[in-house]
């Protein structure tokens, strides 16, 4: 699996976070640091790579806009990315737990996932 870089990753993050089909206009509204020509070009590339699909159209002012939705979940992307880079689960967990931004709630979620996996 190719690693999403730069603006393509930023656009995928917007799509993953919103959890609904979005037009280029909406992506630009949500993340104004992404300029419209960049958003459109990245959407074309993501579409060509079968990472997103057109999920219908909507009116934006007086023009129709295509709405895009991810074909790849964030979880599947992260799993595939870790696998292609040969990152072990222990290395991944170590990096997560040693990061400054992890909260107690996130640690509890990780513990629940580990307990569930252990019970399988």
Model feature map: region roles:
Residues 1-13, 84-86, 120:
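Short alpha-helical segments that sit at the start of domains
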Residues 15-19:
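Short helix-capping/hinge SLiMs at alpha-helix to coil transitions
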Residues 36-37:
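Key DNA-contact positions within bacterial/archaeal DNA-binding proteins
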Residues 3-7, 23, 57-79:
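Short, cationic-aromatic polyanion-contact patches
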């Amino acid at each position: 699996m190719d690693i999403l870089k730069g603006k393509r990753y930023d656009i995928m993050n917007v799509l993953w976070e919103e959890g609904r089909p979005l037009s280029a206009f909406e992506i630009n509204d949500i993340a104004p640091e992404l300029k419209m020509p960049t958003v459109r070009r990245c959407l074309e590339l993501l579409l060509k790579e079968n990472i997103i699909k057109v999920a219908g159209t909507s009116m934006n002012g007086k023009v129709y806009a295509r709405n895009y939705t991810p074909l790849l979940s964030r979880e599947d992307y992260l799993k595939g990315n870790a696998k292609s880079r040969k990152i072990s689960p222990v290395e991944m967990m170590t990096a997560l737990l040693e990061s400054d931004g992890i909260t107690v709630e996130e640690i509890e979620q990780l513990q629940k996932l580990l307990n569930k996996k252990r019970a399988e």
